Amino acid sequence: MKYQKSAEAIAKLSAEQYRVTQENGTERPGTGEYLYNKEPGIYVDIVSGEPLFASSDKYESHCGWPSFTKPIERANVTELTDMSHGMVRTEVRSAHGDSHLGHVFPDGPVDRGGLRYCINSASLRFVPKDRMEAEGYGDYLDQVEG
């Protein structure tokens, strides 16, 4: 499957999805659609469809945004230094869609690598496990629990 950013995909974004993914915005804590989602499946870029995170790597960090211990495929995320708002953080973007996803912090579960990928729900689309094969994500089924 080829993952890319397209004008058509951008045009389908809601105002909030556009603000987050294209203007490096952040959704308000506690408001994201996927914050409490516990269904098995994968999270893909809302713009390009590239697979980003597996439900098996999602955990409750109590930070107000969906949190993951690692990307489903390292090559699908890029990390950049973000010095906005008087802080130094590591921004996470999708590699193919170039969508702003959120940030990664070194305070995740130590036994799972020590990282916390703090991700905006507005940058994601959830693909339930029972739809993964039909939507072309069957190669990732072994990374999803259940």
Swiss-Prot record:
Its EC number is 1.8.4.12. It comes from the Bacteria. PROSITE patterns: MSRB. It comes from Brucella melitensis biotype 1 (strain ATCC 23456 / CCUG 17765 / NCTC 10094 / 16M). Keywords: Oxidoreductase. It holds the Pfam family SelR. The active site is at C118. Residues 6-129 form the MsrB domain. GO terms for biological process: protein repair; response to oxidative stress. InterPro entries: Met_Sox_Rdtase_MsrB, Met_Sox_Rdtase_MsrB_dom, Mss4-like_sf. Belongs to the MsrB Met sulfoxide reductase family. It catalyses: L-methionyl-[protein] + [thioredoxin]-disulfide + H2O = L-methionyl-(R)-S-oxide-[protein] + [thioredoxin]-dithiol. GO terms for molecular function: peptide-methionine (R)-S-oxide reductase activity. GO terms for cellular component: cytoplasm. SUPFAM superfamilies: Mss4-like. This is Peptide methionine sulfoxide reductase MsrB.
